[in-house]
């Protein structure tokens, strides 16, 4: 039985640590499956880059080119998932939905590709709460995908509307040159749209080019600029020497009040929160100037190591999600077996499951509050020692029988005094 419990705990720890990497690998494999599908076609998509005039264009090449680009985008986007970027998660959902619809319509016999795509979509939706980070890498991927799509559209659009320009666009290189010239809004005037359709097309390229450029620059350089501006205004961020401190995981009301109370008593506290970047700023303002907040997943071993788990006094899992609290304790004990753990339980139904992770202290504020209310309404006497005993035992049986007897004995001695 002990071997099974050890295996179960190890498997749980591996799942918590590697689930995001597994998901990124699944998205990457979806891209490879698309490449495998293209490789088996009789049409060579690379021939599309050797076209010199529109008259040489085989429409079958253009029909399959989006599938090739879809595979490229999925492979690139899997990198963003490794950083748990919210933007990468959203783009992956969109790309996989497009791939699923495309495959169902044109290649319905590819059962494995369809099934694996559906599995990855479900996997992404299940882990949606884990992807809340803002990442420069994800912004770079988004910028590359947007720029590549716009370049493809503008180049072959100009080649398709070649007769609407003066002079006429007759080669792929000329169309590519016109696309870059228009997207950058340089406009040398050597190629001028003369037909109505060509002018409307040029307007769409100009607007799209400005939008993609502005969005890309914001996604990539925005976080860097904001960080530099904050340092300029506020000075260097307070860096706490993380030793003999408390680690609080979560941003619940209980967690925030606990942090404030510990700070009032001069204790050093490091907070781990998976809130979005803007909400992290609000949390830091609420906790004060000396707040030491680490953005990230409290189940991630690298985040716990950064928080100084091997040098802390205790780690407190105080989020509103009982499962997340249990995973925090499992991850903490896996990294440092001697660390003291405190776990908050919101739902009494989860108490028996919570006990399996063996935290040092289990607190159940809801059960504690209901017990106090029942005693008050029943007219029972309540003193400070009884309140402490009830709070520490709100998790039902977190101490051994000897510990409970010692607590009761101490309460009697205090009452006699």
From Swiss-Prot:
Effect of changing residue 411 to N: reported as: In strain: ECOR 46
What name does this protein carry?
Voltage-gated potassium channel Kch
Ranges in the Cytoplasmic compartment? 1-21, 84-86, 128-140, 221-417
According to the UniProt topology, which residue ranges lie Periplasmic? 42-63, 105-110, 161-199
Q: List the GO terms this entry assigns under cellular component, sorted alphabetically.
A: plasma membrane; protein-containing complex
Q: Which PROSITE patterns match?
A: RCK_N (PS51201)
**Result when mutating residue 13 to K:** In strain: ECOR 52 and ECOR 60
**Residues spanned by motif Selectivity filter:** 185-190
Q: Where in the cell is it found?
A: Cell inner membrane
**One annotated GO biological process:** potassium ion transport
The principal location of this protein is membrane
Source species taxonomy: Bacteria, Pseudomonadati, Pseudomonadota, Gammaproteobacteria, Enterobacterales
Per the record, membrane topology reads:
Multi-pass membrane protein
What family does this belong to? Belongs to the potassium channel family.
Functional summary from the UniProt entry: K(+)-specific ion channel. May play a role in the defense against osmotic shock.
Q: What keywords are assigned to this protein?
A: Cell inner membrane, Cell membrane, Ion channel, Ion transport, Membrane, Transmembrane, Transmembrane helix, Transport
InterPro entries of this UniProt entry?
Answer: K_chnl_dom (IPR013099), NAD(P)-bd_dom_sf (IPR036291), RCK_N (IPR003148), Trk_Ktr_HKT_K-transport (IPR050721)
Q: Which SUPFAM superfamilies match?
A: NAD(P)-binding Rossmann-fold domains, Voltage-gated potassium channels
Q: Which GO terms describe its molecular function?
A: identical protein binding; potassium channel activity
Q: Keyword Oxidoreductase on this protein?
A: no
| Segments traversing the membrane | 22-41, 64-83, 87-104, 111-127, 141-160, 200-220
Whom does it interact with, and what assembly results?
A: Dimer.
Give residue ranges for domain RCK N-terminal.
243-363
